[in-house]
């Protein structure tokens, strides 16, 4: 499965013009009541098909651009349309009556419609640099190194907003507090999930819970990291600490949501005195599926389902996209399965987190981040294909909870140049390099030169003394870079399995809480590609929100992350 491109053009709701004069007062009152007397496009946007069959939505409109909607202009447009309609329709008025009535009904449906199918994608840590680096990488690698950007499925969406992310305690928030803001419309402290700040004694109900209870929507939650991690948990759990993993797992089972998929619970056995999280879910009526074949066999009508990915990697999360084996399910596959299991006449809400973008950026692994953004784009494309079949009932939102790593496109030693094609030589994430190679180096005290042969094979970085040095191009290491790598390698062997407990402040500034050698390798290939990071933590940068579908226009402009909840609540009518 995994991210097939759609060849269908993106469809937009049509405007219907028959007998508009009768409905103009009602429509105007509705626009006023809903706060629509601002800037709004009256006509559907043009569509074309982008390269490789991708839908590409151009931000231009038929007939007119955007206009300030006043009562006078609103009535002018309506009166003109009514006059034209009466003159042209008079000879065949009787024959056209049934079609006109149907058009009226469709027009009213469009004016008052609410999204029946809601997709919310959260790229954890996905700031604008993460998105743009993926676009640049895609464009240059698909065009023989040319300086051109590629399109992602969601960067073609017609509406774009900019979102602030700070929480009650910091301008550089964490995922628990930011996901709480998105899910409930409330600020809280870093590390707290859906509880009021400071006292932590009042739970906040989430948009997913309200849609489930008040509107009978089916609900799904997907994450490429642990299913009880902060972001997915913020749609079903209420905890004073994001580290209450077992209790979060119990809340998952008690939520009654119809579909969960992702990595393993972080403390699946709790304190060992009670049932594990799998057993708790099964007792609550969930089908607990732990194999890919079992997940593939699920069909609509399967009932409440919890899928734990079969192929687990670092931290019992799903693999980075660049590390996934051929045929291994990725985010796209779980989105497709979620759509299949959730689709129903009442509607659904599906939250999907690409959590390993954040993990990659914490580790300053630019290539891993890029590949996970590209995989998230594939997952969004699956939702776009669903939208194409339900254009008047579907809303797709793509955003981030915060930015991670302070990613920058541009580096001191490359000046105004970037060489993103260098990143094609990186064959695996830092995490897979650690588990496949570095753990063995530590155990066996492998010589530096031997380790560098593996670095060449998996990252392309080549020592000046290598027999193939003349063919290394821009990945040939300078003496300065070799010395930095050697120091990091020696420090790795010194620290060994004890990890950060023996690391100094200087170590932290150089390598964060990660294995020094792996970080030095990532930094080196990043810098040679023209990329850098400022931190191993989160930043306070604004993030983008991309929207398409019913109510998408509400998400344009600049607003706080709490407004995402409030806009969704207004659109769906939950209290």
Regions found by a protein language model. Name each.
Residues 187-250:
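Extracytoplasmic mature domains of secreted/periplasmic and thylakoid-lumen proteins
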Residues 114-130, 135, 199-214:
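Active-site-adjacent structural elements in enzyme catalytic domains
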Residues 21-30, 35-73, 77-87, 95-96:
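N-terminal secretory signal peptides
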Residues 170, 174-198:
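A glycine- and small-residue-enriched flexible loop/hinge segment at structural boundaries
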Residues 6-9, 13-15, 20-21:
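Cationic, low-complexity basic patches in intrinsically disordered or flexible, solvent-exposed regions
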Residues 115-117, 126-131, 136-180, 229-575:
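A post-motif C-terminal structural segment
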Residues 89-118:
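C-terminal segment of N-terminal export signals and the immediately downstream linker at the start
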């Amino acid at each position: 499965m995994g991210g097939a491109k759609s060849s269908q053009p993106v469809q937009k709701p049509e405007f219907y013009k028959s007998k508009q004069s009768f409905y103009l007062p009602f429509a105007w009152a509705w626009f006023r009541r809903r706060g629509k007397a601002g800037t709004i496009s009256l006509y559907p946007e043009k569509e074309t098909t982008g390269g490789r069959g991708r839908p590409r939505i151009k931000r231009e409109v038929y007939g007119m651009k955007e206009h300030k909607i006043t009562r006078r202009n609103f009535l002018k447009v309506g009166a003109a349309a009514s006059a034209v309609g009466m003159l042209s329709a008079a000879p065949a008025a009787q024959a056209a009556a049934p079609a006109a009535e149907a058009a009226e009904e469709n027009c009213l449906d469009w004016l008052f419609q609410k999204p029946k199918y809601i997709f919310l994608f959260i790229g954890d840590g996905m700031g604008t640099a993460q998105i743009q680096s993926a676009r640049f990488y895609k464009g240059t690698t698909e065009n023989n190194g040319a300086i051109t950007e590629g399109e992602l499925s969601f960067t073609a969406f017609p509406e774009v907003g900019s979102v602030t992310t700070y929480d009650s305690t910091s301008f550089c928030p964490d995922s628990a507090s930011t996901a709480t803001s998105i899910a409930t419309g409330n600020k809280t402290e870093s590390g707290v999930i859906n509880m009021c700040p400071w006292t932590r004694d009042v739970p906040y109900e989430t948009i997913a819970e309200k849609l489930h209870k008040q509107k009978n929507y089916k609900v799904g939650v997907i994450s490429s990291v642990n299913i009880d991690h902060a972001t997915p948990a913020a749609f079903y759990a209420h905890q004073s600490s994001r580290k209450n993993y077992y209790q979060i797992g119990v809340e998952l089972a008690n939520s009654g949501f119809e579909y969960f998929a992702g990595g393993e619970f972080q403390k699946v056995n709790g304190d060992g005195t009670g049932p594990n999280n799998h057993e708790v879910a099964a007792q609550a009526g969930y089908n607990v599926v732990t194999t890919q074949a079992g997940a593939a066999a699920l069909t609509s009508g399967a009932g409440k389902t919890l899928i734990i990915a079969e192929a687990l990697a670092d931290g019992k999360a799903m693999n980075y996209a660049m590390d996934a084996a051929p045929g291994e399910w990725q985010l796209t596959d779980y989105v497709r399965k979620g759509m299949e299991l959730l689709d129903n006449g009442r509607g659904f809400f599906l939250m999907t987190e690409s959590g390993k973008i954040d993990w990659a950026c914490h580790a300053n692994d630019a290539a891993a981040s890029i590949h996970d953004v590209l995989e998230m784009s594939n997952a969004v494309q699956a939702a776009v294909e669903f939208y194409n079949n339900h254009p008047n009932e579907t809303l797709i939102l793509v955003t981030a909870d915060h930015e991670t790593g302070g990613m920058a496109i541009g580096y001191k030693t490359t000046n105004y140049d970037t060489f993103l094609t260098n990143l094609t030589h990186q064959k695996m994430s830092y995490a897979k390099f650690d588990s496949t190679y570095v753990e063995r180096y530590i155990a066996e005290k492998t010589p530096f030169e031997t380790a560098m042969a593996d670095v060449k094979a998996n990252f392309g970085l080549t020592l000046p003394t290598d027999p193939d040095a003349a063919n290394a191009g821009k990945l040939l290491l300078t003496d300065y870079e070799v010395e930095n790598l050697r120091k990091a390698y020696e420090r790795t062997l010194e620290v060994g399995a004890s990890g950060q407990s023996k690391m100094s402040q200087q170590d932290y500034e150089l390598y964060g809480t990660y294995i020094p050698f792996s970080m030095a390798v990532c930094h080196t290939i990043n810098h040679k590609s023209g990329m850098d990071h400022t931190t191993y933590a989160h930043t306070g940068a604004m993030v983008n929100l991309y929207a398409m579908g019913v109510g998408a226009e509400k998400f344009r402009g600049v607003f706080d992350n709490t407004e995402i909840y409030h806009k969704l609540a207004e659109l769906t009518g939950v209290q």
